A protein has these predicted regions:
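Hydrophobic or amphipathic alpha-helical targeting/insertion segments
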Residues: 89-93, 111, 115-116, 120
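Short, charged, surface-exposed secondary-structure boundary motifs
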Residues: 43-46, 107-111, 180-182
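N-terminal glycine/serine-rich phosphate-binding loop of ATP-dependent small-molecule kinases
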Residues: 1-95, 123, 149, 194, ...
Length: 207
């Protein structure tokens, strides 16, 4: 008798999310959407945020549906890049993450490049310059109470993975969207972070 592996895939996009049940018997892969839900920014006080608590509730609902349909042996979760969450010393969420379309990073390049040149940042990180990149989001927040309290920095998908597993880590592909991952050293560029006045001790292992 063929052994069937049942896997759950959580796919979050900017406008919707879904949970897929995948059944693999060694010859065939069957996919079934077991849960779909809307996603989008929440506007609060002229800013746009992700409602990560509701999204996590939807993820759990979808995983329960998948688990009721078949015993799960593994799960995977993905979202967009650049956005992140900050946790305090007790691993409590410090506010809902900013949405990448929020205007709080408008004009950030001029301020950041006054401290570290565009050429140096590119030489260290090698990715496209966008004001939504995590480096610039964190830069505009650098004097905020949220950053002062922060003890952990997790990309959005890794926040959900932490809540599901209890393990803190930032997945490699998402870490490269921060613009403070340095491929030359295969890790966070702590010297770049220091030059920009950003914390350099709140980032978990890259996996």
């Amino acid at each position: 008798m063929k052994q069937t592996h049942n896997l759950a895939a959580v796919d979050l996009g900017a406008s919707s999310g879904r949970v897929i049940l995948a059944r693999l018997d060694g010859e065939h892969l069957r996919l079934e959407e077991v849960h779909r839900f809307p996603n989008g920014p929440v506007r609060v006080a002229d800013h746009m945020h992700w409602d990560v608590l509701r999204l996590f509730d939807e993820i759990k609902t979808g995983l329960c549906k998948a688990g009721q349909a078949a015993p799960l042996s593994s799960l995977g979760l993905d979202t967009w890049g650049v956005d992140f969450a900050l946790l305090d010393r007790d691993d409590q969420l410090i506010g809902n993450p900013f949405h990448y379309r929020d205007p709080h990073t408008n004009g950030v390049f001029e301020k950041a490049f006054a401290l570290v040149s565009r050429d140096e940042i590119f030489e260290r990180t090698g990715i496209q310059f966008m004001q939504i990149n995590s480096l610039f989001q964190l830069f505009v927040m650098r004097e905020s109470a949220a950053v002062e309290r922060a003890r952990s920095f997790l990309m959005v998908p890794d926040l959900f993975n932490f809540w599901l597993t209890g393990r803190k880590a930032n997945e490699y592909c998402n870490a490269t969207t921060t613009q403070f991952y340095n491929p030359r050293i295969d890790g966070y560029d702590r010297e770049l972070l220091a030059k920009l006045g950003l914390p350099n001790d709140i980032y978990p292992q890259i996996v």
